[in-house]
Amino acid sequence: MSISSKTEDSDIRSSVMTDHGPSGMKRLAGLSLAALGVVFGDIGTSPLYAVRECFHGEYGITASAGNVLGVLSLLFWALVLIVGLKYLTFIMRADNDGEGGILALTALIITHSRNRGYERWLLVAIGLFGASLLYGDGMITPAISVLSAIEGLQIIAPAFHEMVIPLTMLVLAGLFLFQHNGTARVGALFGPIILLWFIAIAILGIIEIVKYPQVLQAMLPWHGISFLLGNNLKGFTVLGAVFLSVTGAEALYADMGHFGRRPIRITWFLLVLPALLLNYFGQGALLLSSPGEAHHPFYGLVPSWAMIPMVLLATSATIIASQALITGVFSLTQQAIQLGYLPRLTVTHTSARHMGQIYVPAANWSLMVGTIGIVAWFGSSSKLAAAYGVAVTATMLISTILFYYIARDLWKWNPAALNVMITFFAAIDLSFFGASMSKLFHGAWVPLAVALVMFTIMNTWKQGRKLLMRQLQDRTLTVDEFIRSLALQQPQRVPGQVVYLTANPDVVPIALLHNLRHNKVLHSEVALFHFSNERVPRVPNSRKIEVDRLGDGFTRVIARYGFLEYPNISQVLALANQQGLNFKPEGISFFLSREKIVAGEKTKMFPSRKKLFALMARNALSATAYYDLPSGQVIEIGVQVQI
């Protein structure tokens, strides 16, 4: 699943919605092709392992005619109901100013939900855990995708078996080491390569279906129902492997803001769904005629002369699918920073044209270590499949829950109809989640453990910042009180323009009080800058800056930024000066407070979490670097705070 945003894409998206002429159709086609490389890479490479795991994996079932038709029926209806009906028809209606994804949906609930108190806290916690699951998915998906593609080498020649793991680790290492360069130059190739991939897998499927057309009767739902009823618990556990066919469906919703609903829907129904079904049914036809091919039915469709080109194409497709997920983790990390769930981290823009193309070193190296470690630990894509899926099923279930509250509280949908719909989708989600959880002790715990760690980190940072702000607020006074005190006892004023960054626009920054207490002077022009992180993707320039003249040489500037934007001090100064601030950038001194966190007995936070918060605070990117302040004009004042 990936979450990303590009300013130019938003403009194109808008024009596609309004322009139905030749130019509009051309733009729609271009956007649909681009969506192929970003949105559909994950779900598009699932044929490499989904059918195989149903019949050959650790939880596989015998490849009899009834079982093959039953599994194909479940695959068909999973794609139709989960992707086509649930996501493309309903979930994609829930957007936060055009943006999709778990965090965007959670922010929408915080802003508009009528729930208060414990219920609202629980919804936010569920949404935050859903976002945390992406980090676990971000380690598993590249590992299983690239590994399953390169495993085709051992089909070409069994002697290549020993090379599979080292080659996979080498490809993954190269992928992560390349991230700092961005994808601007090679990104244009993603769409055409994935297009070629879908055409190739569709042709491979058609060739086998023509030989065994009886396989098409698997579209009848009775075959799937009969399979589940006839195989009892074994059939239920196979659902976990069936679900591998829809991993990546969440990306359709998460990347909605990147490409828009229409291009994603058109691409899915006209190309992706037909290609996937043709390949899955082709693999089924192969198993009906040759059950012995269950060890790798995908490569069983490939003629011997095309095996090497197909392995190369599959590897390229899985690298692109992994790239989309890595980019999604970068974007999610940036959103979490902006929404106050993670400390400030280095975020590098890799493209001057596209604001959505970013690189987050901390996230990149964490994913690299985790992904390569997972490949080394599990050793095969079949073993990895047991760990795959549980994070995605949990995310889908969480999306269903959050969607219910949006439809109920924000859209005021008919309660009876909404309850029926949500019960139907929740039953599907719970079935797949239960089947995936049956593999808990065979690797499914890995992404859950990663998600739990990330949830703890994000929740600890959010709670720690609240406690820190409360402690600082108790040690200062309000801006109004401070301005009134100046009229009673005016300190010595010295010429100069200074900016104090403040986390709370209503109270005096600690740095200002310490400067006044120790230096006994106050500058003639003082601006209090507050960066407000809004729960919307973007804030237009017309509403971004609020300038408030407080009197006695004081001005308060509130800069509002969305969770997909990056704070920019130069932009803030320019917009504020347009409203009469008249601060000269080269002559400003920036005063910051740097808090030293000390674990104490003043708050109820667990000692271990206090230590974790203090550790994150010490290693967070400095405000000077994060806001790109001119280092030669910055004065930092230290303050020790006990929590």
Swiss-Prot record:
What the entry lists under InterPro entries is as follows:
K+_transporter, K_trans_C, K_trans_N, Kup
Q: Kindly give the membrane topology term recorded for this protein.
A: Multi-pass membrane protein
Signal peptide residue numbers: none
Q: Which reaction does it catalyse?
A: K(+)(in) + H(+)(in) = K(+)(out) + H(+)(out)
| Record carries keyword Coiled coil | no
This protein's source sits in the domain of life called Bacteria
Q: Which UniProt keywords apply?
A: Cell inner membrane, Cell membrane, Ion transport, Membrane, Potassium, Potassium transport, Symport, Transmembrane, Transmembrane helix, Transport
Annotated region (Disordered) at 1-20
Cellular component terms per the entry's GO annotation: plasma membrane
Q: Where is the composition biased (Basic and acidic residues)?
A: 1-12
Localization (cell): Cell inner membrane
Which GO terms fall under molecular function for this chain's record?
potassium ion transmembrane transporter activity; symporter activity
Annotated transmembrane regions: 28-48, 65-85, 121-141, 158-178, 187-207, 224-244, 268-288, 301-321, 358-378, 384-404, 415-435, 440-460
Q: What does this protein do?
A: Transport of potassium into the cell. Likely operates as a K(+):H(+) symporter.
The similarity comment for this entry is: Belongs to the HAK/KUP transporter (TC 2.A.72) family.
The protein here is known as: Probable potassium transport system protein Kup
Q: Which organism is it from?
A: Chlorobium luteolum (strain DSM 273 / BCRC 81028 / 2530) (Pelodictyon luteolum)
